[in-house]
């Protein structure tokens, strides 16, 4: 296969399909989503058979159990796919909305209309459910998409692509609106991220090594985040009960997500009250604690252990594991300075009863999501009321934070006049 020619052809067809998608009615888009959902229900066994072959190859390669679990399409996973498709169909269609319409002294009206981005390239790893999630959001937002999944899920993704194509055709929409790259050759990724004439944006969903490669090689703009080094700062004016709840949930609700707390900052004025209780809670949940000297002194005095001395590297680390770095700081100034220096601009929280300090934290912490008296785990499209998300961005341009339907659109100015000319 000539990868360069193959990817160019996918891009050309996607660009052509994107024009039809931009003018597609809400009813047609919803009909396509429903048709795909019904096709998955109808062909569930065929999907599981294709997936079983992928899973068998993954096991033969010696891939770990966690990877195989992400790859597997269980009955529950298929049900979640179907529910997700119908949920996206139920969301309000943002395309064509005109907002901020204002009369100007010249007599014209000026507003902004929400429009699709065009062609979106999605690059992801082992989870075949992303094929459906990404296709659904791109379809509903009027975009065409090129999906490049992990090589380990090649048969699963091909089977899903067939059903997506059927759903699009049933609704009178172009099948090329959703195309799945049918090769495991890594050169396909290299071509996709440089096709500026056909692809408007890339959304990567994967590990740090993938994102770093794309940052270095992509010519197409990206919606991405590299790390989730999330902090909770407990102020000396915090409510202890709230602090315990927030810090427990932010770390132990799930360890392997990008919105999990990785560093806990505690004001020196509350450390002696909070850390012994929190340390015992983490110890009981088998969380490894990597602590600075001040935190060690308080925790050791309370009989909490074992403790590991934190190094400079710990403040830079996204563990994605039951490991937590803890630092005692002098107060709000030191906490904000630490977060802005070591953080990844993803999600950070303060626990405090002081309104002025809370507002200052919201203003000065340079992150996509900033929270007061709430767990960092809330940084999620569903929890934010977006209905669904394609990912989280910690960049500052275009989309920031959880990216839902609106994040896959842009705005263009529209002008309504009555024959006016500029004076």
From Swiss-Prot:
<keyword id="KW-0560">Oxidoreductase</keyword>
<keyword id="KW-0521">NADP</keyword>
<dbReference type="InterPro" id="IPR016161">
    <property type="entry name" value="Ald_DH/histidinol_DH"/>
</dbReference>
<dbReference type="Pfam" id="PF00171">
    <property type="entry name" value="Aldedh"/>
</dbReference>
<comment type="pathway">
    <text>Amino-acid biosynthesis; L-proline biosynthesis; L-glutamate 5-semialdehyde from L-glutamate: step 2/2.</text>
</comment>
<protein>
    <recommendedName>
        <fullName>Gamma-glutamyl phosphate reductase</fullName>
        <ecNumber>1.2.1.41</ecNumber>
    </recommendedName>
</protein>
<dbReference type="InterPro" id="IPR020593">
    <property type="entry name" value="G-glutamylP_reductase_CS"/>
</dbReference>
<dbReference type="InterPro" id="IPR012134">
    <property type="entry name" value="Glu-5-SA_DH"/>
</dbReference>
<keyword id="KW-0963">Cytoplasm</keyword>
<dbReference type="InterPro" id="IPR016162">
    <property type="entry name" value="Ald_DH_N"/>
</dbReference>
<comment type="function">
    <text>Catalyzes the NADPH-dependent reduction of L-glutamate 5-phosphate into L-glutamate 5-semialdehyde and phosphate. The product spontaneously undergoes cyclization to form 1-pyrroline-5-carboxylate.</text>
</comment>
<comment type="similarity">
    <text>Belongs to the gamma-glutamyl phosphate reductase family.</text>
</comment>
<dbReference type="GO" id="GO:0055129">
    <property type="term" value="P:L-proline biosynthetic process"/>
</dbReference>
<dbReference type="GO" id="GO:0004350">
    <property type="term" value="F:glutamate-5-semialdehyde dehydrogenase activity"/>
</dbReference>
<keyword id="KW-0028">Amino-acid biosynthesis</keyword>
<dbReference type="InterPro" id="IPR000965">
    <property type="entry name" value="GPR_dom"/>
</dbReference>
<dbReference type="InterPro" id="IPR016163">
    <property type="entry name" value="Ald_DH_C"/>
</dbReference>
<dbReference type="GO" id="GO:0050661">
    <property type="term" value="F:NADP binding"/>
</dbReference>
<keyword id="KW-0641">Proline biosynthesis</keyword>
<dbReference type="InterPro" id="IPR015590">
    <property type="entry name" value="Aldehyde_DH_dom"/>
</dbReference>
<dbReference type="GO" id="GO:0005737">
    <property type="term" value="C:cytoplasm"/>
</dbReference>
């Amino acid at each position: 296969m000539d990868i360069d020619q193959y990817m160019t052809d996918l891009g050309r067809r996607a660009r052509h399909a994107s024009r039809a998608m931009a003018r597609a009615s809400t009813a047609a888009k919803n009909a396509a989503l429903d048709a795909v959902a019904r096709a998955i229900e109808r062909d569930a066994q065929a999907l599981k058979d294709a997936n079983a072959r992928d899973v068998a190859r993954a096991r033969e390669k010696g891939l770990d159990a966690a990877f195989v679990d992400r790859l597997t399409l269980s009955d529950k996973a298929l049900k979640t796919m179907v529910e997700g498709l119908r949920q996206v169909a139920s969301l309000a269609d943002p395309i064509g909305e005109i907002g901020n319409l204002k009369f100007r002294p010249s007599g014209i009206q000026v507003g902004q209309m929400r429009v699709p981005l065009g062609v979106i390239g999605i690059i992801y790893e082992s989870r075949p459910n992303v094929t459906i999630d990404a296709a659904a959001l791109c379809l509903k937002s009027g975009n065409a998409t090129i999906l490049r999944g992990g090589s380990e899920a090649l048969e699963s993704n091909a089977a899903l692509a067939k059903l997506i194509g059927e759903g699009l055709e049933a609704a009178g929409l172009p099948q090329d609106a959703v195309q799945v790259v049918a090769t495991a050759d890594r050169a396909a990724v290299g071509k996709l991220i440089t096709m500026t004439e056909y692809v408007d944006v890339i959304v990567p969903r994967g590990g740090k090594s993938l994102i770093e490669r794309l940052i270095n090689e992509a010519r197409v703009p990206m919606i991405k985040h590299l790390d989730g080094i999330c902090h909770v700062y407990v102020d000396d004016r915090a409510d202890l009960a709230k602090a315990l709840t927030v810090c427990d949930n932010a770390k132990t609700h799930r360890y392997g997500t990008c919105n999990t707390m990785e560093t806990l900052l505690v004001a020196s004025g509350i450390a002696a009250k909070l850390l012994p209780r929190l340390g015992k809670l983490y110890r009981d949940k088998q969380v490894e604690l990597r602590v600075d000297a001040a935190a060690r002194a308080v925790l050791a005095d309370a009989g909490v252990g074992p403790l590991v001395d934190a190094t400079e590297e710990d403040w830079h680390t996204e563990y994605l594991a039951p490991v937590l770095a803890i630092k005692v700081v002098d107060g709000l100034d030191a906490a904000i300075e630490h977060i802005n220096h070591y953080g990844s601009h993803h999600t950070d929280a303060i626990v405090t009863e002081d309104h002025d300090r809370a507002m200052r934290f919201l203003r000065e912490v340079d992150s996509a999501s900033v929270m007061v008296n709430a767990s960092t785990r809330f940084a999620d499209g569903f929890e934010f009321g977006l209905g669904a998300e394609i990912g989280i961005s910690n960049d500052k341009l275009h989309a920031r934070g959880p990216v839902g339907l609106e994040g896959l659109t842009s705005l263009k100015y529209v002008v309504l006049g009555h024959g006016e000319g500029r004076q």
